[in-house]
A protein has these predicted regions:
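Distinct, well-ordered alpha-helical segments
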Residues: 59-60
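RNase H-like polynucleotidyl transferase catalytic core
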Residues: 45-50, 65-83, 100-102
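Acidic/histidine-rich, metal-coordinating catalytic segments
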Residues: 20, 38-56, 76, 130-133
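Short small-residue beta-strand/loop micro-motif enriched in glycine and branched aliphatics
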Residues: 11-15, 71-73, 97
Length: 144
């Protein structure tokens, strides 16, 4: 699972992959940047853990190409990345282990709907009990 979380909004983007290679992480980053851009969010920085994919030259080069400043958390300090760690717990409780799925395929297929509910409907206590998407003020047609 590769997850991206907006620092201000807490809007979440996630993809399920069977590996954590630099190529996969870079692909997720590119798609996440495009996904956030379509919602009016410009990605300036990315905070990641110290996995080998995020320490690679390819990751650094991709960030440079996208105009993003990469930063890594301090080793053995998950608190540094507390927002995403908390999101992972919410993801596990609300999607991964919420119910018994008939198969891994069924569980994977349920992720987009869960993410939509999380982003658009689920109140988030850290942002005034509003859904994360409400923090994005540049959405096309929002004020029409």
């Amino acid at each position: 699972m590769h997850t991206v979380l907006g620092h201000h909004s807490r809007v979440a983007y996630a993809e399920i992959h069977d590996d954590e290679t630099a190529a996969t992480a870079i692909g997720v980053l590119r798609r996440a940047v495009a996904w956030f851009a379509a919602r009016g969010v410009t990605t300036q920085r990315v905070l990641s853990d110290n996995g080998s994919c995020y320490r690679s030259h390819a990751w650094r080069d991709a960030c440079t190409e996208l105009g993003i400043k990469p930063k890594r958390t301090r080793p053995y300090r998950p608190q540094t990345n507390g927002k995403i760690e908390r999101f992972h717990r919410t993801l596990a409780d609300g999607w991964a282990f919420q119910r018994l799925y008939s198969s891994e395929s069924a569980r994977r297929k349920a992720l987009p709907a869960w993410l939509h509910g999380y982003n658009h409907h689920r109140p988030h206590t850290a942002i005034g009990k509003t859904p994360p998407i409400s923090r994005l003020t540049n959405l096309a047609g929002q004020y029409n």
